[in-house]
UniProtKB/Swiss-Prot annotation:
Belongs to the dwarfin/SMAD family. The keyword Transport does not apply. The gene is sma-3. One of its GO terms (biological process) is anatomical structure morphogenesis. Residues 197-393 form the MH2 domain. This is Dwarfin sma-3. Residues 136-190 are annotated as: Disordered. InterPro entries: Dwarfin, MAD_homology1_Dwarfin-type, MAD_homology_MH1, SMAD-like_dom_sf, SMAD_dom_Dwarfin-type, SMAD_FHA_dom_sf, SMAD_MH1_sf. GO terms for cellular component: cytoplasm; heteromeric SMAD protein complex; nucleus. Zn(2+) binds at residues 65, 110, 124, 129. It comes from the Eukaryota. It comes from Caenorhabditis elegans. Coiled coil: none annotated. PANTHER family: DWARFIN SMA-3, SMAD.
Length: 393
């Protein structure tokens, strides 16, 4: 890198001194150069070039927002690639292996976070105003360089195979190789949504225990405690009884503790799971696996007190659009609307238990809203081998 520094001004050279990692040096230099130009000539927004130098020299979250104006499509072009600004500069100065905006979350004190960037003309690129969420276990710690956005027919396979060909996170993509505007699929025309956005069924091994819980609130906690009061924001598994419960199940239930929190972020078009317990939680979501370019059957481990995006609506709507007039594709897509969550014990190729029904305590989350969109599309599709959607079909 030293051989190239003489080509840049003193501000760029200084900022490059805090760069993390040795990969993609020329791209990082272009990214820093573009940022310096924007910070020098901006008249509005928050934060200066000096503020950026200060926070990089003295890393802390108690620092000013450093903003740049958003482009029409929300992305910043660096050389021949486009990317989300906050991801680009977190990649330069904090985490060179960042591959998706879903791996980042803004801190509470940030005034111009990416999550609310649709409501303002500016976005904060202070790398210390973002926290990194947990990466699903099995995702390489060193991600490859950004690749071209995949073509529509390779984003998802409707043949029922366990893997999908996906060059990058399809929607929204972190980077695209061409300089053009990247299309982000929006929610189709509205229709009458189901009264409950999802429902949860609790299982012990292969037996359902208790009623099916219908979720109306957008945020709900599922824990292992007993709560005699009826609450539509909390499901307490501790009060459910099962005469066939064995010692392994009893021991697992003791470790559920504070459990998980489900958040349907309607404004951000995704669903998050937060693990509030002191034990890991295991999740199988085909939508997440496709988004992370992993086998569709992959089981992700969420460490204690960590989060994972388990459903991305933009990706779903993109796949729904591609499944027009394809009943097999719609049947396959319905499987993406069922998410399995196991407490404490994992399953799959990395664990002794091969199937979720072999885990002591697990949940099935059925997403009613995307299933309703599929049902709406099915009514417009020739009915060949259409099946009632469920997690086992």
């Amino acid at each position: 890198m030293n051989g190239l520094l003489h080509m840049h001004g003193p501000a760029v050279k200084k900022l490059l001194g805090w760069k993390i990692g040795e990969d993609e040096e020329k791209w990082c230099e272009k990214a820093v150069e573009a940022l310096v130009k924007k910070l020098k000539k901006k008249n509005n927004g928050c934060g200066t070039l000096e503020d950026l130098e200060c926070v990089l020299a003295n890393p802390c979250t108690n620092s000013r927002c450093i903003t740049i104006a958003k482009s029409l499509d929300g992305r910043l072009q660096v050389s021949h690639k486009k990317g989300l600004p906050h991801v680009i500069y977190c990649r330069v100065w904090r985490w060179p292996d960042i591959s998706s905006p879903h791996e980042l979350r803004s801190i509470d004190t940030c005034s111009y976070p990416y999550e609310s960037s649709s409501k303002t003309m500016y976005i904060c690129i202070n790398p210390y105003h973002y926290q990194r969420l947990s990466r699903p276990q099995g995702l390489n710690s060193s991600m490859p360089s950004p690749q071209p956005i995949s073509s529509p027919n390779t984003i998802w396979q409707s043949s029922g195979s366990s893997t999908a060909s996906c060059a990058s996170s399809p929607s929204p993509s972190v980077f695209s190789e061409d300089g053009g505007e990247v299309q982000v699929h929006q929610r189709p025309p509205p229709f009458r949504h189901p009264k409950s956005w999802a429902q949860i069924t609790y299982f012990e091994l292969n037996s359902r225990v208790g009623e099916v819980f219908k979720l109306v609130n957008l945020s709900i906690t599922v824990d292992g405690y007993t709560n005699p009061s009826n609450s539509n924001t909390r499901i307490c598994l501790g009060q459910l009884t099962n005469v066939n419960r064995n010692g392994t199940i009893e021991n697992t239930r003791m470790h559920i503790g504070k459990g998980i929190q489900l958040d349907n972020k309607e404004d951000q078009m995704h669903i998050m799971i937060t693990n509030n317990s002191d034990m890991p939680v295991f999740v199988q979501s085909k939508n997440t696996n496709l988004m992370m370019n992993m086998p569709l059957v992959k089981v992700c481990r969420i460490p204690p007190h960590s989060q994972l995006c388990v459903f991305e609506f933009n990706l779903f709507f993109q796949m729904l659009e591609q499944s027009c007039n394809d009943s097999d594709g719609l049947n396959e897509l319905s499987k993406h609307c069922f998410i399995r969550i196991s407490f404490v014990k994992g399953w799959g190729e990395d664990y002794p238990r091969q199937d979720v029904t072999s885990t002591p305590c697990w949940l099935e989350l059925r997403l009613n809203v995307p299933l309703a969109y599929i049902d709406q599309k099915m009514k417009q599709t020739p009915r060949t081998n259409l099946m009632e959607p469920n997690s086992m079909t």
